Amino acid sequence: MEIRKLDPAVYAGRKFTARYRTNGYYAILPCESGFQMRYTAFEAPVEKSFDDEFFGEWLDHPVAYGVFEGDRLVGYVEGAIEGWNNRYRISNICIFDFENRSRGLGQALMNAILREAEASGARMVILETQTCNENAIAFYRRNGFEIIGFDLYSYSNDDPEKCEVRIEMGKKLI
């Protein structure tokens, strides 16, 4: 396994599909004091996927690292500073194939992007995930991230019914 910085001239615009499996989700429920989150198991495991591309045009000067086995890219992480609020956004972190997960590759990528974020002088690192991506939520929590917000209708008007609500997670650096 080797971590390498990815060249935007080579990777920009390349497409990939991110997949994950989940056994449940965190329902965001209104309550008297605001909202609460409650874990709910699905009746059967669910597989989710979405298509994306490297070095999205919406990012300002993104940096990306790949994890390679030989010449094969098996995962990557991408991030960029948000100058207006001095936060570093991790826009993607993904190990492409299920058989390569739980081998420390995601942790190696997280370590690389956290070093990049610290070097940028950012006050905080932030990222987005979904309430149904329970493995990602657990991974981010192990890395010191906490839930800092949510958007009930970020992806569609049916996100709560789809059990896929956007959550923002963050980790203070300074």
Locate the predicted segments by residue:
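Extreme N-terminal starter segment of soluble prokaryotic enzymes
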Residues: 1-2
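Acetyl-CoA-dependent GNAT
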Residues: 5-99, 110-112, 116, 172-174
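Short, charged low-complexity linear motifs
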Residues: 6-7, 121-127
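Residue-level signal for alpha-helical context at structural boundaries
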Residues: 30-32, 108, 131, 158
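Conserved glycine-rich acetyl-CoA-binding loop
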Residues: 72, 96-111, 115-120, 131-138, ...
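C-terminal "cap" of GNAT-fold acetyltransferases
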Residues: 123, 130-137, 142-146, 150-174
